[in-house]
């Protein structure tokens, strides 16, 4: 219980820093887990570092701000408020956010900006439509039950599995399209 109390106190004092650290750790663990499950001969620590950096720099800080923006969405009816937040998140923010994540992942891999955009275009539709099978339900739970400072952390706990899939999806060579390197 002391560890949980310390975590809660740290989150209350430094929400962004705590969210960044937890997000990076969970995302990196998701990639390492994927490498283990797919039977890679050796651990690609650089790949795990890229996923850790992706979450810590390009995911947690924007989500921290985004959830505070969504807090401003108000309705007199609690159900309408939660549904509005989820809808805005999934249909206005998520399409762009997924694209930004995919481009940044490729930039971290060392691809040029134009090649990163090409790769994003190749992966985006599948990633976004797959995200719609998971994240609306998660966000409904998030907006109904989870205090604001914990929302990024809940997202990253669920994202352990999502990031495992995303790592698999983006790190497996595309056999059907020889133009994508």
Curated annotation (Swiss-Prot):
It holds the Pfam family Mpv17_PMP22. One of its GO terms (molecular function) is channel activity. It is a multi-pass membrane protein. InterPro entries: Mpv17_PMP22 (IPR007248). One of its GO terms (biological process) is regulation of mitochondrial DNA metabolic process. It is found in: Mitochondrion inner membrane. Keywords: Membrane, Mitochondrion, Mitochondrion inner membrane, Transmembrane, Transmembrane helix. One of its GO terms (cellular component) is mitochondrial inner membrane. The chain crosses the membrane at residues 20-38, 48-70, 91-113, 140-162. Belongs to the peroxisomal membrane protein PXMP2/4 family. Involved in mitochondria homeostasis. PANTHER family: PEROXISOMAL MEMBRANE PROTEIN 2, PXMP2 MPV17, PROTEIN MPV17. This is Mitochondrial inner membrane protein Mpv17.
